[in-house]
């Protein structure tokens, strides 16, 4: 089964219609509620977006329903924490609904369930270690707010209680106490399961180069030799034009799709959803049932994105310990 066979075909988008295919909510380490996020998208005239929480699709169905009501097409997605070649990789998987009950989707949904169970266990272990060290966490239930308690909530509670200043210090505290926040699935297994379910697999933020590490051309070729990933997130909030050009070239030279995402976690954290032009990722959108009119002029070239980072701005992000500092270890 492939995504084209199961996607709902939408009216054709214009080349400059706004899309953002990498957004987070409070289902993982974000602070947008589905209602707040979809309302923002509608108010700012986005046509298509994708909710890609870390290892969770708990917000997807609500966001899809709200999107239908407000005129924003929400593509089901998830950012799966995977491992390959001795390190973690964030994999954006598009096109798989969390309410699937068919055999084709069973393995992929099982991977997410396994990650959820491991994250809950890691969170409870971290809580016990922190409290045993004399640092109580009485507001943990308040911080989790009825959601499954994941490591991110434990870290956030440690900050709220004044035990540490930021997420990086919180993660270091748990590591020093012998705990772990790592939960990931084998990349090859995840891609295979996603493809069985009709999903499309895109390597997230290959040029970011902070806690999750940048992707080199050699990395990509070694990966493609054994794992059939489908694309690269070649447009990203922190990329300069030179980085976007590099990852578009790496994708096109290898027949890969291109995705566009802000990685917004909350209002202005690190950024609001970005209005990427639909034609910049038209191939991916078409595979997901969203056709795009291709302009007669250049699809993308340097200078087209007014929000592209300047070279001096393209540095390691989140120096003060915002969620991206510890994404690789906390999901």
What are the residue ranges of the model-derived segments?
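Charged catalytic cores and adjacent phosphate/nucleic-acid-binding surfaces used
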Residues: 1-39, 44-46, 58-76, 80-100, ...
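Polyanionic/metal-chelating signatures
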Residues: 97-133
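Short, flexible active-site loops
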Residues: 111, 140, 171-178, 204-205
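Active-site glycine- and acidic-residue-rich loops that bind
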Residues: 144-148, 176-185
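Short, acidic loop-to-helix structural element flanking the phosphoryl-transfer center
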Residues: 181-195
């Amino acid at each position: 089964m492939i995504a084209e066979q199961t996607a709902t075909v939408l009216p054709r988008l214009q080349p400059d219609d706004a899309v953002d295919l990498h957004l987070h909510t409070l289902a993982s380490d974000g602070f947008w509620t589905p209602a707040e996020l979809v309302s923002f998208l509608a108010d700012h005239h986005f046509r298509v977006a994708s909710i890609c929480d870390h290892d969770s699709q708990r917000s997807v169905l609500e966001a899809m329903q709200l999107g239908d009501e407000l005129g924003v097409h929400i593509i089901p997605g998830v950012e799966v924490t995977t491992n390959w070649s001795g390190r973690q990789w964030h994999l954006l998987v598009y096109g798989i609904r969390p309410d699937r009950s068919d055999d084709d989707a069973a393995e992929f949904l099982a991977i997410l369930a396994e990650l959820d169970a491991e994250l809950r266990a890691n969170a409870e272990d971290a809580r016990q270690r922190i409290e045993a060290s004399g640092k109580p966490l009485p507001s943990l239930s308040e911080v989790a707010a009825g959601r499954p308690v994941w490591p991110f909530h434990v870290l956030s509670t440690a900050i709220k209680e004044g035990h540490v200043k930021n997420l990086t210090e919180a993660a270091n505290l748990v590591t020093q106490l012998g705990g772990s926040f790592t939960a990931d699935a084998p990349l090859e297994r995840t891609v295979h399961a996603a493809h069985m379910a009709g999903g499309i697999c895109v390597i997230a933020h290959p040029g970011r180069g902070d806690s999750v590490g940048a992707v080199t051309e050699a990395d990509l070729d070694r990966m493609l030799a054994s794992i059939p990933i489908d694309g690269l997130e070649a447009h990203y909030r922190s990329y300069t034009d030179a980085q976007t050009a590099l990852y578009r070239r790496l994708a096109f030279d290898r027949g890969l799709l291109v995705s566009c995402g802000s990685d917004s976690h909350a209002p202005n954290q690190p950024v609001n959803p970005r209005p990427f032009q639909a034609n910049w990722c038209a191939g991916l959108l078409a595979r997901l049932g969203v056709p795009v009119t291709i302009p007669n002029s250049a699809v993308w070239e340097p200078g087209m994105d007014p929000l592209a980072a300047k070279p001096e701005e393209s540095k390691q992000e989140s120096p003060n310990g915002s969620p991206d500092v510890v994404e690789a270890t906390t999901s």
